[in-house]
Amino acid sequence: MRTEYCGQLNLSHVGQEVTLCGWVNRRRDLGGLIFIDMRDREGIVQVFFDPDHKAAYEQASELRNEFCIQITGTVRARPDSQINKDMSTGEVEIFANTLNIINRSEPLPLDSNQTNSEEQRLKYRYLDLRRPEMADRLKTRAKITSFVRRFMDSHGFLDIETPMLTKATPEGARDYLVPSRVHKGKFYALPQSPQLFKQLLMMSGFDRYYQIVKCFRDEDLRADRQPEFTQIDVETSFMTADQVREVMEKLVRELWQETKGVDLGDFPVMTFAEAMRRYGSDKPDLRNPMELVDVADLVKDVEFKVFSGPANDAKGRVAALRVPGGAQVTRKQIDEYGQFVGIYGAKGLAWLKVNDRAAGVEGVQSPIAKFLSAEVLEAILARTQAESGDILFFGADSFKVVTDAMGALRLKVGRDLALTKLDSWAPLWVVDFPMFEDDSEGGLSAMHHPFTAPKDMSPEQLAAAPTTAIANAYDMVINGYEVGGGSVRIHRTEMQQQVFGILGINEEEQREKFGFLLDALKFGTPPHAGLAFGLDRLVMLLTGTDNIRDVIAFPKTTAAACLMTDAPSFANPASLQELSISVVAKKGATDSSVEENQ
């Protein structure tokens, strides 16, 4: 039906007759001529209809936005005065000879001239995706996945599919369950990741595996989370953590070069402990130059209990954040920052403005200055490398509260005061995570997942001191986003059973949930390691949006609903009966449709 795409026409096509298919992006009448901007997947080109071509001209008078049309015409060069430098096709236009209105459009529920609500955009997603910026994002996504496949193929990785209907295993989030009609009362789980299957593929001898795969997690959603998401999943045998990182870093560097024309350079490597200490986050945004500076040793003996209390507590922390040029911040802004850190459990936010560094303590302004000696103030100014015009913010509380609150404040202030270089890229690897962390019930949970191997520990050593164990794990972070994470896996039965035991999984439960894995580990399992990238998050970064829904064709809302199809929906009672499922309404429920399905 077409000979060319609208957005690919240029001066090399001048004089050629072309047939185009697409949509009316805009129509306007000028001096007896009818002009339209015609749009397809590749872009927009201007088409004009002359009254001398009566049939096409009369039809063109009927055109409205989003009519689906086909035109045949001749490509002409625009006069210099009419060249549109904002369009890739701005040097040419089409003189239409024939017009075929394929399909008409009703008035749109979306307004192309203003910002529509996200609810409207998601409800009419098929119209929202016609917008060039949305189409460009999905085209970029397609190019990224194509590039990844070429790279992985060229490095000896095999694309192998793993099951979508599998067994529920504890991986940190709730599973989406699928009832079995054949096996009454039993349920499949949609995979949170292909973790165990890719490990089993290594045990099967496939050596290098990858897959671009859908994963499912029933968890609370944020702007960068979806209930169904896509991973670039990777696993290798006989490779160390350093070797895995080397190949995956090469993939990302080449991807950025291909997509953005940017050389990311070598990725620095930082331990988890260093990242938390300096930046208050295990995914630090290194575009922001500010760092947290520990000052507990300087304030241990001061009479100001807000500082000396945490400074003398083994589980406490006192940290300062120097904000270059921050003395301009108003008292109102400081109060707002105090409220902000309260979200993270901080009880307040102490501050100190450095008006004149050369004047020493006489050049500072702060409500806490009177509680600190000249020697302590000078020591704090020296350690933080404070300069005239700076402000220091202080956090003093438990290590977790201070780290979380000051880390979040660092990011907020960096954006508020334009200190974060938003037009740059700052990748790094974060390594040496704790193997375990405290859970809400007083036990331990795996910081990554229960199949991660510890660094340099035997099962006996791990059992004796689990809280000191360091995981052989690594995360790739770019601009404050964790874009990928992985680890060396446990490849011995004894170690895997020991980890399960530390996590409170008894032998009976181990056999019930992971018997197949424990059996497989007995048969010459090779050392193996892997990593998974969040494809959606990578595309989000590479297309410059801060909302993951912008890079998914048909995403869910933060309530895990599809406004376009009205999913999830109530099931037919006959289907539920066939599955031996009874829907029980919550106490106090008033939804009649729930009651009907009881």
Curated annotation (Swiss-Prot):
<feature type="binding site">
    <location>
        <begin position="217"/>
        <end position="219"/>
    </location>
    <ligand>
        <name>ATP</name>
    </ligand>
</feature>
<dbReference type="InterPro" id="IPR012340">
    <property type="entry name" value="NA-bd_OB-fold"/>
</dbReference>
<dbReference type="InterPro" id="IPR004364">
    <property type="entry name" value="Aa-tRNA-synt_II"/>
</dbReference>
<dbReference type="GO" id="GO:0003676">
    <property type="term" value="F:nucleic acid binding"/>
</dbReference>
<feature type="region of interest" description="Aspartate">
    <location>
        <begin position="195"/>
        <end position="198"/>
    </location>
</feature>
<feature type="binding site">
    <location>
        <position position="217"/>
    </location>
    <ligand>
        <name>L-aspartate</name>
    </ligand>
</feature>
<feature type="binding site">
    <location>
        <position position="489"/>
    </location>
    <ligand>
        <name>L-aspartate</name>
    </ligand>
</feature>
<dbReference type="Pfam" id="PF01336">
    <property type="entry name" value="tRNA_anti-codon"/>
</dbReference>
<feature type="binding site">
    <location>
        <position position="171"/>
    </location>
    <ligand>
        <name>L-aspartate</name>
    </ligand>
</feature>
<feature type="binding site">
    <location>
        <position position="448"/>
    </location>
    <ligand>
        <name>L-aspartate</name>
    </ligand>
</feature>
<keyword id="KW-0030">Aminoacyl-tRNA synthetase</keyword>
<dbReference type="Pfam" id="PF00152">
    <property type="entry name" value="tRNA-synt_2"/>
</dbReference>
<keyword id="KW-0067">ATP-binding</keyword>
<dbReference type="GO" id="GO:0006422">
    <property type="term" value="P:aspartyl-tRNA aminoacylation"/>
</dbReference>
<keyword id="KW-0648">Protein biosynthesis</keyword>
<dbReference type="GO" id="GO:0005524">
    <property type="term" value="F:ATP binding"/>
</dbReference>
<keyword id="KW-0547">Nucleotide-binding</keyword>
<feature type="binding site">
    <location>
        <position position="482"/>
    </location>
    <ligand>
        <name>ATP</name>
    </ligand>
</feature>
<feature type="binding site">
    <location>
        <begin position="534"/>
        <end position="537"/>
    </location>
    <ligand>
        <name>ATP</name>
    </ligand>
</feature>
<comment type="subunit">
    <text>Homodimer.</text>
</comment>
<dbReference type="InterPro" id="IPR004365">
    <property type="entry name" value="NA-bd_OB_tRNA"/>
</dbReference>
<dbReference type="InterPro" id="IPR029351">
    <property type="entry name" value="GAD_dom"/>
</dbReference>
<dbReference type="GO" id="GO:0005737">
    <property type="term" value="C:cytoplasm"/>
</dbReference>
<feature type="binding site">
    <location>
        <position position="226"/>
    </location>
    <ligand>
        <name>ATP</name>
    </ligand>
</feature>
<dbReference type="InterPro" id="IPR006195">
    <property type="entry name" value="aa-tRNA-synth_II"/>
</dbReference>
<dbReference type="Pfam" id="PF02938">
    <property type="entry name" value="GAD"/>
</dbReference>
<dbReference type="InterPro" id="IPR047089">
    <property type="entry name" value="Asp-tRNA-ligase_1_N"/>
</dbReference>
<dbReference type="InterPro" id="IPR045864">
    <property type="entry name" value="aa-tRNA-synth_II/BPL/LPL"/>
</dbReference>
<dbReference type="InterPro" id="IPR047090">
    <property type="entry name" value="AspRS_core"/>
</dbReference>
<comment type="similarity">
    <text>Belongs to the class-II aminoacyl-tRNA synthetase family. Type 1 subfamily.</text>
</comment>
<keyword id="KW-0436">Ligase</keyword>
<dbReference type="InterPro" id="IPR004115">
    <property type="entry name" value="GAD-like_sf"/>
</dbReference>
<dbReference type="GO" id="GO:0004815">
    <property type="term" value="F:aspartate-tRNA ligase activity"/>
</dbReference>
<comment type="function">
    <text>Catalyzes the attachment of L-aspartate to tRNA(Asp) in a two-step reaction: L-aspartate is first activated by ATP to form Asp-AMP and then transferred to the acceptor end of tRNA(Asp).</text>
</comment>
<keyword id="KW-0963">Cytoplasm</keyword>
<dbReference type="InterPro" id="IPR004524">
    <property type="entry name" value="Asp-tRNA-ligase_1"/>
</dbReference>
<protein>
    <recommendedName>
        <fullName>Aspartate--tRNA ligase</fullName>
        <ecNumber>6.1.1.12</ecNumber>
    </recommendedName>
</protein>
<dbReference type="InterPro" id="IPR002312">
    <property type="entry name" value="Asp/Asn-tRNA-synth_IIb"/>
</dbReference>
